[in-house]
Amino acid sequence: MHEYSIVSALIEQCEQYAKANQATKVTRVEIKLGVMSGVEPALLQTAFETFKLDGICREAKLCMTLQPLVIKCADCQQESVLDERSIVCPACNSYHTRVLDGEEMLLMQLEMEQAEDA
């Protein structure tokens, strides 16, 4: 299950941002997850809940925005947003398409807290 290694890298990235911003904890992690990223949202959530327990993200909530597939057809120039995992142009049924969005997983935003000054 590659979601474990993905979450491990995500938490490491969160820890680096928290350290750079003198944060004591991360309360929210927002990611954009493309439908063609190869990452299963439910497994990612489970992995996050497991791996966050020992670090600065232990109280963090993982928020996922699912990004549909966006393609552009080289034949008819149609740009399409697709819910299914298909690279066929819905306008002309061409396979000559280019993926514009929906293949990656991106860290979009972190909410962090800093220690209160005494």
From Swiss-Prot:
Keyword Metal-binding: yes
Keywords, sorted A to Z: Metal-binding, Nickel, Zinc
Record's protein name: Hydrogenase maturation factor HypA
Similarity remark: Belongs to the HypA/HybF family.
Chain positions recorded as Ni(2+) binding sites: H2
General function of this protein: Involved in the maturation of [NiFe] hydrogenases. Required for nickel insertion into the metal center of the hydrogenase.
Gene name of this polypeptide: hypA
Any Pfam family matching the protein: HypA
GO molecular function: nickel cation binding; zinc ion binding
Binding sites annotated in the UniProt record for Zn(2+): C73, C76, C89, C92
Organism: Shewanella oneidensis (strain ATCC 700550 / JCM 31522 / CIP 106686 / LMG 19005 / NCIMB 14063 / MR-1)
Keyword Lipid biosynthesis: no
Phylogenetic classification of the source organism: Bacteria, Pseudomonadati, Pseudomonadota, Gammaproteobacteria, Alteromonadales
GO biological process: protein maturation; protein modification process
